[in-house]
A protein has these predicted regions:
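Pre-ATPase regulatory/linker segments immediately N-terminal to the P-loop/RecA-like helicase/translocase core
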Residues: 2-25, 31, 69, 80-206, ...
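Non-catalytic helical/coil scaffold and regulatory linker elements
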Residues: 272, 277-339, 461-478
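Beta-strand cores of modular interaction/reader domains in eukaryotic scaffold and signaling proteins
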Residues: 74, 87-89, 93-97, 110-112, ...
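Short, basic/aromatic beta-hairpin or loop at an interaction surface
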Residues: 61-74
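Conserved helicase motor core of SF1/SF2 NTP-dependent helicases
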Residues: 241-244, 252, 360-613, 620
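ASCE P-loop NTPase helicase motor core
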Residues: 106, 123-125, 179-292, 332-341, ...
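Short, solvent-exposed loop/turn positions at domain surfaces
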Residues: 82, 194, 343, 558-560
């Protein structure tokens, strides 16, 4: 295996080496995630679970409608009007139990929505006796992801596993960069000509052309350079080539929805796989579930379901032979239901040009037996290598990876898996292999003064500003040191403290200043609540800021740095938290995290930080 002695290999001499390495890494990740959940449930008392926001107690539930045949249950707190602090977010897999999920069989559901006063959860099967008990809510672990990544690794290991670009992806060839640049072989057709959208700038157009002419293309998109815009135009160009159904994936549901929205706007026939609850509401009409509900064969399906339900209701009063025949008919009925469902899905997939889903979602069994010669992965630098391979093992002959290895890497829970290489994305390994990414070099988000520092320190001054200062005027409500340079540092003398749950950090003095700055900007009337974002490296500070905000500020987003990648706001308030004599800036020493934090703002960036930390010199650009 090739690569540095201290890090994971960049290339592999045998597919077996790759298989063994990554199979161990994903096993460690699953084991450590489940052990982490188990230890907290076993060892933490009720008070600590509540303070850490990972468990809610004393919930009462009631049915609250349906989402494409799945039951929605609304949970509220029996003892108080609001839900209190918690870390549950839309799309999270959760466990519902009466007392203890480790001592009973919990119900598994998915968070549909959260508010100050309630949490709505979607269940595949309607829970029984939901109104008769009080419930507790815990976060669950995602074993499906492990199973699908394991299957993908097995396919890569197997020469007949349906991965035409296997040797290139693993570096098992003499000259990977040259091989990556070769014309793809797409079903016997060596590259059909296509047209490109007129709204691409020069770097975007170069990337789009490469994506249709090369076997493997890496596209690096720094903040605000139009990664998703370019990805959508590539997918549109591919769809006009009419070579076969295209697979478009990303690591997160948010990024998949952005691709979906762009494709729908361009008139591309697209279907979105995945649970509708995880899809943006206005896009749910493009989900497989919604399309199945509107399919002409839906009536046949409902008729068969009604017949089965009638038999189920009557069977308890039957005896002997009659009962045996009824069971036989029910079994035949379910077989017919599955046949109709498969027929509907196949018809939808046969007529679609692009299938959109998450990397892990592309392992869904409804795609089994299908091949996708062209695969695009957005957010490729936030996906672990095994997650990316789930999509690439669907028969990819032409691949585009879009991302930015100067921003946040994949999220990995297991320290040992991270140390051995799981935190390195496939995109980054291919860069290390010598395949140079095409740079989208014009940024359209930030005021030039805001983009100056990240351009110098992360992108070697290779970025151009596509917006002028006069188009990003500093907002009122703050006495900017220089109105032509909307980057401000607010020095705070106040110490950091360990959060009440003992797992994070917070800084009360910074919290007070953040709230004051927030109110001052809003009172000026030029910026709305949804135009401001508050970023901090620590979950404890997120909680402290939220707890200090009045109800009228609910619409202001407060997130960790990790929760803000891919997002932008008119104004960003950045609370740094750390305050110590050792000049220890903690999470901020990770330059990729700092890059994300400093590149979310369009018109104004305000850093609130301890006076003597090194961060002020960084921000005074």
């Amino acid at each position: 295996m090739g690569g540095g002695s201290d890090g994971p290999p960049v290339k592999f001499n045998r597919s077996q080496d790759h298989h063994e390495l990554y199979l161990n890494l994903i096993k460690w990740e699953l084991d450590d995630e489940m052990q982490n959940v188990r230890e907290k449930l076993q060892n933490w008392n009720k008070k600590r679970l509540i303070e850490n926001g990972i468990t809610l107690f004393d919930l009462i539930g009631k049915n609250d409608g349906w989402l494409f045949g799945q039951r929605i249950v609304k949970f509220t707190n029996k003892k108080k009007n609001d839900m209190g602090f918690h870390r549950f977010r839309q799309g999270d897999i959760v466990l519902i139990s009466k007392k203890d999920p480790l001592k009973e069989t919990p119900l598994e559901g998915t968070i549909y929505s959260t508010s100050r006063t309630s949490i709505k959860i979607v269940f595949s099967d309607t829970p029984k006796d939901i109104r008769k008990h009080t419930w507790r809510l815990d976060k669950g672990a995602n074993r499906i992801a492990f199973d699908r990544m394991r299957d993908a690794l097995n396919s890569i290991f197997d020469e007949e596993g349906g991965v035409p670009l296997r040797d290139l992806l693993l570096g098992m060839i003499h000259d990977p960069p040259s091989t990556a640049s070769l014309m793809p072989e797409l079903g016997g057709v060596r590259g059909r000509t296509t047209t490109y959208a007129h709204d691409l700038n020069r770097p975007q157009l170069i990337a789009a052309k490469a994506a249709t002419e090369r076997r493997l293309t890496l596209i690096q998109g720094p903040p605000g350079t139009g990664k998703t815009h370019t990805a959508v135009r590539i997918l549109e160009s591919w769809s006009k080539m009419d070579i076969g159904t295209i697979l478009a994936v990303a690591d997160s549901n948010v990024a998949v929805d952005n691709l979906l929205e762009g494709l729908l706007a361009r008139g591309v026939r697209v279907v979105r796989l995945g649970q509708p609850v995880k899809v943006r509401e206005k896009l749910r009409m493009a989900t497989m579930d919604a399309k199945m509900e509107n399919h002409p064969l839906r009536r046949d399906l409902e008729t068969q379901l009604e017949l089965n339900e009638k038999l189920n209701r009557r069977i308890s009063s039957m005896k002997g032979k009659e009962k045996g025949l009824a069971y036989r008919d029910i079994k035949k009925g379910w077989k017919e239901i599955r046949r109709i469902e498969n027929q509907i899905r196949d018809d939808i997939l046969d007529k679609t040009q692009v299938v959109c889903c998450t990397c892990i979602g592309s392992g869904n069994e409804i795609l089994d037996g299908r091949r996708f010669p062209q695969v695009l992965i957005d957010e490729a630098t936030q996906a672990t290598e095994p997650a990316s391979l789930v999509a690439l093992t669907r028969g990819a002959r032409q691949v585009v990876l879009v991302g930015d290895h100067k921003q946040l890497p994949p999220t990995v829970i297991s320290f040992r898996a991270e140390e051995k290489g799981l935190k390195r994305s496939l995109f980054e390994r291919l860069v290390d292999l010598g395949i140079e990414p095409l740079l989208l070099s014009t940024q359209y988000r930030m005021h030039p003064a805001i983009s100056k520092f990240p351009n110098q320190h992360f992108y070697s001054d290779r970025l151009d500003d596509g917006v002028k200062s006069e188009n990003r005027l500093a907002p009122a409500g703050l006495l900017w040191p220089d109105w032509d340079n909307p980057v401000a540092f607010v020095p705070v003398d106040g110490g950091e403290v360990v959060s009440p749950d003992g797992t994070s950090r917070e800084n009360p003095a910074e919290v007070s200043w953040v709230i004051k700055i927030l109110n001052d900007i809003l009172e000026a009337g030029e910026i709305t609540k949804t135009d401001i974002g508050i970023i901090t490296p620590y979950a404890g500070q997120v909680r402290a800021i939220r707890n200090s905000m009045s109800e009228k500020l609910d619409d202001v987003e407060v997130k960790t740095v990790d929760g803000y990648q891919g997002r932008e706001k008119e104004v960003i308030i950045f609370s740094c938290v750390r305050s110590n004599n050792e000049q220890n800036i903690g999470f901020l020493s990770e330059m990729r995290r700092l890059n994300v934090a400093l590149t979310r703002a369009k018109r104004g960036l305000i850093a609130v930080s301890y006076t003597h930390l090194t961060l002020p010199t960084i921000l005074r650009v």
